Amino acid sequence: ITCHIGSGASITAVKDGICVDTSMGLTPLAGIVMDTRCGDIDPYVPLYIMKTQNLSIDQVNEMLNKKSGKYGLGGYSDSRDFEAAYLRGEPAVVDGMKCYIYSIVKFIGAYIAAMGGVDALVFTAGVGENSGLVRKLILEKLSYLGIEINNEVNNATHGDFAEITQHGSKVRAFVIPTNEELVIAKDTCLLYTSPSPRDMRRSR
């Protein structure tokens, strides 16, 4: 299960190298709580806001994409500021962090059920690669899986490849730096040279 956690974020279930499910929907707005995006909400919420607040589609779109998530919960749009406020004990941010972590753990749990188990968790992107605190809070919620975090390695890992679980941990956890540009370039090349999407899937 990959946890791509940055300003935007997604959780993805991968089995035998193939994506089984992802928290994103038609757009990256769906899924977990993000820096300024709301993540999954009741589909009626935007309609209710438009009706009761007399807002336009564009205004609600801006609210859901740029004024929600951790920013809406705690008042900070930058994850580093949000984390610092959490460590200071700001009540709104402490509650916001609980909501944020819960949304991530909920998707991980759902994907474990969908795949019938999990071998490894991967943390990547800005927060996933650099925040030992967020990784620790997530993994602590998953300790029932037999995950044993290596706190020393976890705290020291910032943007580098590392295994952050102890030797013998039943489920392993890794930090793996992302390279979205390279993946886009490779997929574009495959799309250009493959006769059909099915051929592209086999090539990967």
Where are the language model's segments positioned?
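Predominant activation on well-ordered alpha-helical scaffold segments within soluble catalytic domains
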Residues: 43-51, 58-65, 80-83, 105, ...
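Internal helix-turn-beta structural module
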Residues: 94, 98-114, 128-191
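Hydrophobic alpha-helical segments, chiefly the membrane-spanning helices
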Residues: 203-204
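Conserved small/polar residues in nucleotide/adenosyl-binding loops
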Residues: 192-199
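Glycine-rich phosphate-binding loop of actin/hexokinase-like ATP-binding domains
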Residues: 1-51
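A mobile "lid/hinge" subdomain adjacent to the ATP/sugar-phosphate binding pocket shared
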Residues: 53-96
